[in-house]
């Protein structure tokens, strides 16, 4: 069908496999994104404050994602965390200041914001998007 691929794993060969399979089936492959950064980024002017709000939601999200994993499969969503501190240490879920987000963007080629992850308060999600648009994106556009 030539639909886009947003892979759930960071294995670099997935893009090649996808394109070859599209060709084999007679379809021109769509664009592909192979993620390279955390699976969730929230931008905050006070990460500790927002971790207190996001932590329980993110931990529940990680538990659901873990329950869907099957033996032998790899996924960026795979987490062994059972506490918020463990989740923070893993780095798959991150709450960053605008400057920390800019720095992260210089190291990875994909950024997954996912503002309403697992039922995050829409007002909190909107604040993150406003910080991204107002403080992160302008710095990325000038670099």
Where are these regions (language model features)?
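Residue-level detector of alpha-helix boundaries and kinks
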Residues: 3, 35, 86-89, 117, ...
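C-terminal helical cap(s) of enzyme catalytic domains, especially alpha/beta-barrels
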Residues: 15-21, 121-141
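Residue-level preference for alpha-helix termini and adjacent loops
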Residues: 58, 92, 116-119, 130
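A structural signal for isolated positions on well-ordered beta-strands in alpha/beta enzyme cores
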Residues: 4-6, 36, 112
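Glycine-enriched alpha-helix->loop->beta-strand junction motifs that scaffold or abut catalytic
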Residues: 1-6, 107
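An alpha-helical appendage that flanks or caps ligand/catalytic pockets
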Residues: 11-110, 141-143
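Glycine-rich, proline-tolerant flexible connector loops at the mouths of alpha/beta enzymes
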Residues: 9, 113-125
